[in-house]
Amino acid sequence: MKLLAIKVECSYELEDGLSFFMQDELDAQGIESRKRSDFVLEGQKHDSSLVELDDIENLPEDLELTAYFEYKNADKKKIIQKITDKIAEMKGYGLDAGNVSISTKEVADEDWNTAWQKYYHVIDFSRHLAIVPEWEDYQPAFSDQQLIRLDPGLAFGTGGHTTTQLVLLAMERALVKPMSVLDVGTGSGILAIAASKLGASHVLGTDISDEAVTAAKENIALNNIDNIDVRKANLLKDIDEKYDLIVANILADILLELIPDLDNHLNENGKIIFSGIDYLQLPKIEKALEENNFVIKMKMQEGRWIGLLIARKPN
């Protein structure tokens, strides 16, 4: 099967929003995100044989985002126009699009299935967690370091993005055994797996995408974990249970939809972790939390991305 690859070179500020749009709205079969800084820094830190420096030199200074579509069903001109319109919309929110360039090419499906693996390598996140591709042999750097093994497949998170790492950082601080955890928008399942590894008694991961549910289940199986359930759900709809910790690494506009339903799904003294928030969108998140009787206990920032640890206001 042939695939149509549409490559967008732009500012990293568009990464989350544009990735979500191409996957969710345009039904991309896969998303590949590459930044020169990611590979150079990780290559220097881990000396990974998966990092090919010759290829790095060909990367743009900012972001290269490639979406893959089934060739026979793809309307190339229509897709490019929709991407162009979305970029214009995001610029209207105040995001810097950088120097935008869009190009296309045909690729063989079998080439994609293995070629992307060379860009995915160990992320030695902390003394407690390391994210490891399932084909790599990696020994923990610390005796108590937990390994999260992932096969990211065609799409979904690999743990390398700042927004994911902000959640992991907050989870290391906030998750206490034996908390129950709800991961809204689980994607690859990385946060659900991390919660289990950090001592959660039970974890539920939800996603609106059938493909994400399948990917998460496969990654959970790779880690031999039996206390995580995954189901298809739209945010908190059809979720009846309450949890000690709710995590959501999704776009700010979707977090705004989530906030009014949080109280009904949070146990007494429960906590919430948000990420995926561009700093320009933080004021409206803060306003919605205030209006729904929540208070921010900890704020984390890396670049323009914000992570929040949230609790109910004290009585």
From Swiss-Prot:
Task: Give the CDD domains listed for this entry.
Answer: AdoMet_MTases
- Has UniProt tagged this entry with the keyword Plastid? no
Cite a single GO BP annotation. Answer: methylation
Q: What is its main location?
A: cytoplasm
Q: Which residues bind S-adenosyl-L-methionine?
A: T164, G185, D207, N249
Cytoplasm as a keyword of this entry, yes or no, is yes
User: What are the UniProt keywords, alphabetically?
Assistant: Cytoplasm, Methyltransferase, S-adenosyl-L-methionine, Transferase
The terms under GO molecular function for this entry are: protein-lysine N-methyltransferase activity
Compartments reported by the entry = Cytoplasm
Please provide one cellular component term from the Gene Ontology annotations of this protein: cytoplasm
Q: Write the Enzyme Commission number(s) for this entry.
A: 2.1.1.-
- Disulfide bridge positions per record: none
Which InterPro entries does the protein's record reference? Ribosomal_L11_MeTrfase_PrmA (IPR050078), Ribosomal_PrmA_MeTrfase (IPR004498), SAM-dependent_MTases_sf (IPR029063)
Q: Which reaction(s) are listed as its catalytic activity?
A: L-lysyl-[protein] + 3 S-adenosyl-L-methionine = N(6),N(6),N(6)-trimethyl-L-lysyl-[protein] + 3 S-adenosyl-L-homocysteine + 3 H(+)
Q: Which PANTHER family match?
A: ELECTRON TRANSFER FLAVOPROTEIN BETA SUBUNIT LYSINE METHYLTRANSFERASE
Q: What does this protein do?
A: Methylates ribosomal protein L11.
Family that this chain belongs to: Belongs to the methyltransferase superfamily. PrmA family.
This protein is called Ribosomal protein L11 methyltransferase
